[in-house]
Amino acid sequence: MSVNEIILDMAKAARAASREIGKCSGQVKDKVLTDIAALLKEEASFLYQENAKDLEAAKESGLSSAMIDRLTIKEATIESMAQGLVEVAAMADPVGSMVKMWQRPNGLSVGKMRIPLGVVCMIYESRPNVTIDAAGLCLKAGNAVVLRGGSEAIHSNRALGQVIAKALAKNGLPETVVQLVPMTDREAVKELLAQEEYIDLVIPRGGEGLIRFVVANSSIPVLKHYKGVCHVYVDEGADHGMAVNICQNGKVHRPGVCNAVETLLVNEAEAAAFLPKVAEVLGKDGVEFRGCPKTCAILKDAKPAQEEDWPAEFLDLILAVKVVKDMDEAMDHIAKYGSLHTETIVTDNYTRAKRFCREVDASAVMVNASTRFNDGGQLGLGAEIGISTSKLHAFGPMGVEELTATKFVVEGQGQIRS
């Protein structure tokens, strides 16, 4: 069979399977999730064996140590994946719930009910745990899902797919509820992105290059975020100790993730006193500072920032720093260079905090808290399938509810329209 025929058959099978999973009770879906969790532990030796094939190929191809670490399935990885599934199973089933209800003057009751999206296609890179996260959330929301992982994790993903298939079969559901694309070439991705008749939503998760490729080639709606250019603005009168802690956590905790802080904006009234403090603490962590002329005048070790540093997602121990006149200049900078991901203000001024929240355009705005909290688990959504910086359908971390839509349900007593 050609790539086109294989992908078309998968898409058709997913559409048929979506009707089966869509009408499943919450109890059945939760049983599938807990069975997958149990099977992950039972099949650990098999998963390690298949993962070893990917690790060997990764080392031979010269993949970075950081990428190899993300690719590795360890005991802790399996425990984390299993625990995540158990937590999703414990969540309330969103499908069939009424979002709101109201009465019309003619006696009609009008409501909005949560329903599955249908078929989700997830295209992602590197981390095998995304296979389990995506499958678990889609199942909980009553969706069928087609998964296309990165070529570097092909053996690991196939093994995880077999575990999922066992759990589906055990509970009387078609294995086509969760399908993994068996080939790794880009042609398969292009074919997937052309299946608008059968696939309802595409979610790419990976580097900016992958996401732009998906957006450019998809005839299906795409939920995405290109990059996370997150800012911390230190306001006039801000608590310096708090601001240093927030900057350190945002930059150093995990510099390679999308909710890490990339640019620090400091009110000019605080710059002379605050910048040496933050430089001393973050400097010990190996952070390189790239500053505006005013910053460089205060921090002699800072490198002059170039224009390309302001919109940069460094994903490294590098921090761009700019001294601004006031909050308006900070918000103007964010509007020009931000990526609609996460923005933080450190302030003790209630009025300015509220204005910052209202006017700054981002999927999450933090007041006196780290950018690192823009995460489904941290915000109480449970697991997440990614963070969307698209405003249509979902904005911010995408949990189970974001993998559903709503339909109108109208109840009457024989009313007809005049």
Swiss-Prot record:
It comes from the Bacteria. Pfam families: Aldedh. One of its GO terms (cellular component) is cytoplasm. It is found in: Cytoplasm. One of its GO terms (molecular function) is NADP binding. Pathway: Amino-acid biosynthesis; L-proline biosynthesis; L-glutamate 5-semialdehyde from L-glutamate: step 2/2. InterPro entries: Ald_DH/histidinol_DH, Ald_DH_C, Ald_DH_N, Aldehyde_DH_dom, G-glutamylP_reductase_CS, Glu-5-SA_DH, GPR_dom. Gene3D superfamilies: Aldehyde Dehydrogenase, Chain A, domain 1, Aldehyde Dehydrogenase, Chain A, domain 2. This is Gamma-glutamyl phosphate reductase. The gene is proA.
